Swiss-Prot record:
Chief localization: cytoplasm
Family matches, as HAMAP family: TorD
GO annotation, biological process: protein complex oligomerization; protein folding
Keyword Chaperone tagged: yes
Source organism of the structure: Escherichia coli O127:H6 (strain E2348/69 / EPEC)
Protein name per its UniProtKB record: Chaperone protein TorD
Annotated family: Belongs to the TorD/DmsD family. TorD subfamily.
């Protein structure tokens, strides 16, 4: 990625972590369809590899704004995709995708972080990976920790995530009939791939 700063990438990861961690409330639903978000999406589209994924997300948001009981419908989509059994879902855990659930714990320790008691999900939840990546990108911008150390940890985190994120995104596309979370997971997949390529 060339046009986005480390802080902007950190913000994208933090935003995605929030959206994948819990159902959207009314305020978040209003925010994602706001003019401010449209400006943010325009900035993201300035990064060519992200353009198609952001367009897909914007289309799903436009459809969402005319959907009756949008918040309730999205809540049902969230529960069906992320909280049910894995037979027709896209469970957001490394362990559900046959990956080492301890890897994220090791990465968090290496980064000097731990999971919050307010987040009642296992440590291998997708949102934890995204929060870690957000933290690492913010740290790159601060310059207090050697960039080489942060970059090494970022690469380890991206490598671990890339082992199961494509399957997760494919399951979102397969089982999210409305398409909001499918579009969100596609944006995440492209972002992670771009971030990984930026060694």
């Amino acid at each position: 990625m060339t046009t986005l700063t480390a802080q902007q990438i950190a913000c994208v990861y933090a935003w995605l972590a929030q959206l994948f961690s819990r159902e959207l409330d009314d305020e978040q639903l209003t925010q994602i369809a706001s003019a401010q978000m449209a400006e943010w999406f325009s900035l993201l589209k300035s990064e060519p590899p992200l353009t198609a994924a952001v367009n897909g997300l914007e289309n799903s948001i436009a459809t969402l704004t005319v959907r009756d009981d949008a918040r309730l419908e999205l809540a049902a989509d969230f529960c069906g995709l992320f909280l049910m059994t894995d037979k027709q879902a896209a469970l957001p855990y490394a362990s559900a995708n046959k990956q080492d659930e301890q890897e994220i714990k090791r990465l968090l320790v290496e980064a000097g972080m731990e999971t919050s008691g307010n987040f009642n999900e296992p440590a291998d939840h997708l949102a934890i990976y995204l929060d870690l990546l957000s933290h690492l990108h913010f740290s790159l911008g601060e310059g207090t920790v050697p960039a080489r150390r942060i970059d090494g940890l970022r690469q380890k985190t991206l490598t671990a995530l890339r082992e199961w994120l494509p399957e997760f995104a494919a399951r979102c596309r397969q089982y999210d009939s409305f398409g909001f979370y499918a579009a969100l997971s596609q944006l995440l997949l492209v972002l992670v791939e771009c971030d990984y390529q930026k060694r």
